[in-house]
C-alpha cells in the first residue's frame, strides 16, 4: 500500500484537445466537484488505514437514520455515493475536508475504475470473439453455435470457467496508467487521456496510479 489519493466523479463524455505537437488527443471529461472526506480509518480503531470519500448531493429526507448519523458525525451534508480508498497517509486527512481536482495536476498518471456498459444476454461470438462456422454446403444452422463444451462420460460435466453465452458487460473494470491532460480546479473537471469504463453519467473512481512511474 502507498500514499494514494483518489476522487469520485461522474463521467461527462468525451472530447478532444490539441497537444504541444499539434495532434488531436482524445480525452474523457470527469466531474470531480463536491468531493468530501466522510470518514478516516486508522490501524488503532479499524485495523487498517483508509479514507472514505463522499460525492454528489442527495435529498436528506431520503437518507436512512444510520447514514444520516454517519454524515452528521463527519460534519457534512448527505452524499449520494461513497467509496473507500486504502492509503498509508490517511492521517493527513480529516472528516469534513473538501477535496478538489487540485489533487491531480496535469501530467499525473491515474487509474480509473468504473462499471462497463451492460450489453444484456450475448452469444459466444459477441461475448468472447468466437469464430463462426462456414456458411457453405454441409453446414446447417450452425453458423453461430459455440461448438463442443466438453467431453461426454469423462468428466461428465462442463468445467467451471467455460466460455459460453451469458450476460455481457456491467462489470467493474479499471483502466490503468491514464494521463491527466488538464485539471480545471475552478470548475472541478478532469480531462483524462483516452477512454474510461462506463457510459455517460456513470460514477467512476479516479486514483493515483498504483503501477505508474
From Swiss-Prot:
Checking NCBIfam families in the record gives:
L3_bact
Instruction: Sum up the protein's function in the record's words.
Output: One of the primary rRNA binding proteins, it binds directly near the 3'-end of the 23S rRNA, where it nucleates assembly of the 50S subunit.
Q: Which GO terms describe its biological process?
A: translation
Q: Would you tell me the Gene Ontology cellular component terms?
A: cytosolic large ribosomal subunit
Q: In which family does this protein belong, per the annotation?
A: Belongs to the universal ribosomal protein uL3 family.
Q: Name one GO molecular function term.
A: structural constituent of ribosome
PANTHER family on file = 50S RIBOSOMAL PROTEIN L3, LARGE RIBOSOMAL SUBUNIT PROTEIN UL3C
Task: Say which domain of life the source belongs to.
Answer: Bacteria
List, alphabetically, the InterPro entries matched.
Ribosomal_uL3, Ribosomal_uL3_bac/org-type, Ribosomal_uL3_CS, Transl_B-barrel_sf
Answer whether the UniProt record assigns the keyword Mitochondrion to this protein. Answer: no
- Keyword Hydrolase in the entry? The reply is no
Record note on quaternary structure = Part of the 50S ribosomal subunit. Forms a cluster with proteins L14 and L19.
Name of the protein this chain belongs to: Large ribosomal subunit protein uL3
Look up and give the organism this protein is from: Bifidobacterium adolescentis (strain ATCC 15703 / DSM 20083 / NCTC 11814 / E194a)
Keywords from UniProt, A to Z, are: Ribonucleoprotein, Ribosomal protein, RNA-binding, rRNA-binding
Amino acid at each position: 500500500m502507498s500514499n494514494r489519493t483518489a476522487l469520485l466523479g461522474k463521467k461527462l463524455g468525451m472530447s478532444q484537445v490539441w497537444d504541444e505537437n499539434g495532434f488531436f488527443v482524445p480525452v474523457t471529461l470527469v466531474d470531480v466537484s463536491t468531493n468530501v472526506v466522510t470518514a478516516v480509518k486508522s490501524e488503532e480503531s479499524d485495523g487498517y488505514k483508509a479514507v472514505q470519500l463522499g460525492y454528489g448531493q442527495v435529498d436528506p429526507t431520503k437518507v436512512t437514520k444510520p447514514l444520516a448519523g454517519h454524515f452528521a458525525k463527519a460534519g457534512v451534508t448527505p452524499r449520494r455515493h461513497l467509496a473507500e480508498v486504502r492509503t498509508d497517509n490517511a492521517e493527513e486527512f480529516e472528516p469534513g475536508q473538501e477535496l478538489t481536482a487540485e489533487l491531480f495536476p496535469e501530467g499525473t498518471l491515474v487509474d480509473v475504475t468504473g462499471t462497463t456498459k451492460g450489453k444484456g444476454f450475448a452469444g459466444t461470438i459477441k461475448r468472447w470473439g468466437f469464430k463462426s462456422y462456414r456458411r457453405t454446403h454441409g453446414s446447417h444452422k450452425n453458423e453461430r453455435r459455440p461448438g463442443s463444451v466438453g467431453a461426454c462420460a469423462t468428466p461428465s460435466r462442463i468445467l467451471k470457467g467455460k466460455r459460453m453465452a451469458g450476460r455481457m458487460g456491467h462489470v467493474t473494470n479499471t483502466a490503468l496508467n491514464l494521463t491527466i491532460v488538464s485539471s480545471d480546479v475552478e470548475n472541478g473537471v478532469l480531462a483524462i487521456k483516452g477512454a474510461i469504463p462506463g457510459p455517460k453519467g456513470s460514477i467512476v473512481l479516479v486514483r493515483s496510479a498504483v503501477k505508474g512511474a
